[in-house]
């Protein structure tokens, strides 16, 4: 098996499209580093000139005077250096940010395209929150790390290199002292980071647990109150926050040692430089200006070492996030099959021919399943949890492919058809009525973008939802969102029925469409359903058997097998599983009525 490339190597594949901006940002950062490093040296020139001549003037040396022109020239150079430093710093960040944000946009677009191509089975195997995190926080972690770390690495490498060159140029003895402090400083910083890293990781884990606990308790707040679990919930919350406080303290205490340790090493280096430098100044082997330059270089050398040490954790976090992003991008696409287009509209003739299916190898769920459905028929599917009801629909929609056998629609093996053309023949009304942010009109038009306003109103009337829409502020132009509290679940289901009517599909999937609504809305939904199912092949999954009594065929499933089949009356006469289920629900209604 070919070994996968490093995540950072693959990241360059995204960034190289903006390589000129990156190169320009790097050059500007190098310019700012050069301007920063030469600052002590330029100041040293002015200080040397001033101190030397002031000393001679104080001694009364004949002709001693300050070369004002030279000092003025040095100050002009110093100010010009400052302007170049600021411009280099600002525009290096500007161009790097532009390149990184453009790259991140490309990465998110690739993720979005990938999500539309991967099979539905991926979503069954991964939590929604985890996938959302890969789109948002993981990509953002990569963005922040790259934007900050890249220029910090450039800054650290060139600062260290130039400072080493400058101290060796100014004075070999003092230069060697400064250079000797570098590995000591780096080792100290690395040791502290290594000790604190496990606590920071644990802190992140505990913080994640705290977020999950809060989210869980807020979403189940009513249940929490109902069972009087506030005190135990509060105690658990205190335990988590206590752990967070403990690991947070340890992480910050150890990492807080960074600056004292680095400052101690700097102080020691400074002391050696000051003592030996003073001796050399008195001996005339070192100027006062160069002496002050050395002092500044001692302080200047600490920051890049500290940055490089801290970047290790940042880059590790970025790599973890990159790995998670590329895990999604590396997922195999849906198998396209022969991708034949549909030249004619389907009539809705559906056949399951000796179909086998299994989610997990050697654990068959559906075995030798056979079914013939004529155009326009209503087929109801009932059975206990895990019987295979939803799996049948997933196979029909080709969210999964059959293990053996074939499913045909109008004689076409669905594996040979274009998924896009094939799925356009379907309409769905689910218990969890999905509506996206936008106007009601935009939501209804979702399945038929060419629909006119008149067609939208006609579909809404057929779905018994037109009157309700007109009572809303803005009517058909009212903005919908996840917090649309003035629209009940049943009303949302009516809207999805109108949407399905407008799409005019040949085959319908109705999954628990009338569960969890009041009686009045259930009647409206049932009437809307009848309008929707006219002339269309319909597959209905429902627990409330009162909604499927008019079905042409009722399939009773158990462990992926049809154990009973017929219409409502014939299945009651047979007094099998369906009869027991129906009588159980009927008896419950009788008890409630009493």
Named regions from a protein language model:
Residues 1-2, 101, 109-133, 137-139, ...:
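Short intracellular "coupling" helices and adjacent cytoplasmic loop segments at the cytosolic face
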Residues 17, 21-34, 148-202, 273-286, ...:
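Transmembrane helices of ABC transporter permease
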Residues 20-45, 74, 78, 93-97, ...:
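Alpha-helical segments in transporter systems
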């Amino acid at each position: 098996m070919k070994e996968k490339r490093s995540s950072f190597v693959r990241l360059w594949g995204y960034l190289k499209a903006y390589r000129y901006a990156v190169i320009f940002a790097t050059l500007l950062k190098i310019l700012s580093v050069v301007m920063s490093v030469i600052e002590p040296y330029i100041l040293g020139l002015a200080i040397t000139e001033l101190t030397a001549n002031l000393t001679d003037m104080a001694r009364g040396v004949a002709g001693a005077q300050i070369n004002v022109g030279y000092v003025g020239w040095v100050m002009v150079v110093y100010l010009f250096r400052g302007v170049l430093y600021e411009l280099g710093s600002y525009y290096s960040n500007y161009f790097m940010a532009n390149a990184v944000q453009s790259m991140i946009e490309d990465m998110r677009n690739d993720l979005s395209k990938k999500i539309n191509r991967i099979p539905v089975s991926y979503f069954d195997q991964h939590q929604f929150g985890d996938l959302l995190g890969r789109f948002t926080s993981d990509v953002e972690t990569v963005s922040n790390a790259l934007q900050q770390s890249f220029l910090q690495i450039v800054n650290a490498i060139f600062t260290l290199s130039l400072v080493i060159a400058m101290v060796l140029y100014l004075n070999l003895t003092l230069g060697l002292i400064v250079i000797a402090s570098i590995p000591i400083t780096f080792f100290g910083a690395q040791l502290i980071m290594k000790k604190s890293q496990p606590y920071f990781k644990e802190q992140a884990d505990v913080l994640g647990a705290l977020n999950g606990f809060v989210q869980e308790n807020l979403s189940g707040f009513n249940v929490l109150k109902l069972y009087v679990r506030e005190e135990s919930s509060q105690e658990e919350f205190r335990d988590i926050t206590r752990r967070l406080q403990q690991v947070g303290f340890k992480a910050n205490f150890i990492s807080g040692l960074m600056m004292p340790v680095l400052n101690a090493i700097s102080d020691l280096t400074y002391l050696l430089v000051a003592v030996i430098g003073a001796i050399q100044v008195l001996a005339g082997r070192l100027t006062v200006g160069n002496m002050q330059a050395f002092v500044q270089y001692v302080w200047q050398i600490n920051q890049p070492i500290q940055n490089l040490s801290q970047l290790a954790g940042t880059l590790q976090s970025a790599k973890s996030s990159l790995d998670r992003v590329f895990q999604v991008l590396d997922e195999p696409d849906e198998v396209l099959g022969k991708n034949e287009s549909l030249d004619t509209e389907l009539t809705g003739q559906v056949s399951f021919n000796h179909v086998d299916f299994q989610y997990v190898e050697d654990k068959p769920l559906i075995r030798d399943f056979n079914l013939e459905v004529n155009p326009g028929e209503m087929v109801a599917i009932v059975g206990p949890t895990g019987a295979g009801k939803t799996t049948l629909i997933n196979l029909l929609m080709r969210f999964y492919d059959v293990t053996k056998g074939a499913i045909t629609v109008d004689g076409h093996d669905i594996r040979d058809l274009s998924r896009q053309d094939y799925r356009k023949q379907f309409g769905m009304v689910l218990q969890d009525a999905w509506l996206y942010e936008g106007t009601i009109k935009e939501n209804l038009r979702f399945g038929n973008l060419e629909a006119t306003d008149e067609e939208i109103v006609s579909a809404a009337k057929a779905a018994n939802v037109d009157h309700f829409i007109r009572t809303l502020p803005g009517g058909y132009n009212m903005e919908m969102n996840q917090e649309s509290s003035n629209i009940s679940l049943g009303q949302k289901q009516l809207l999805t029925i109108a949407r399905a009517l407008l799409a005019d599909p040949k085959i319908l999937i109705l999954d628990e469409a009338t569960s969890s609504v009041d009686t009045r809305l259930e009647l409206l939904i049932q009437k809307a359903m009848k309008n929707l199912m006219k002339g269309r092949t319909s597959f209905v999954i429902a627990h409330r058997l009162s909604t499927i009594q008019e079905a042409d065929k009722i399939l009773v499933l158990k462990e992926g097998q049809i154990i009973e089949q017929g219409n409502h009356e014939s299945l009651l006469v047979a007094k099998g599983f369906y009869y027991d289920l129906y009588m159980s629900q009927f008896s419950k209604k009788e008890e409630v009525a009493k």
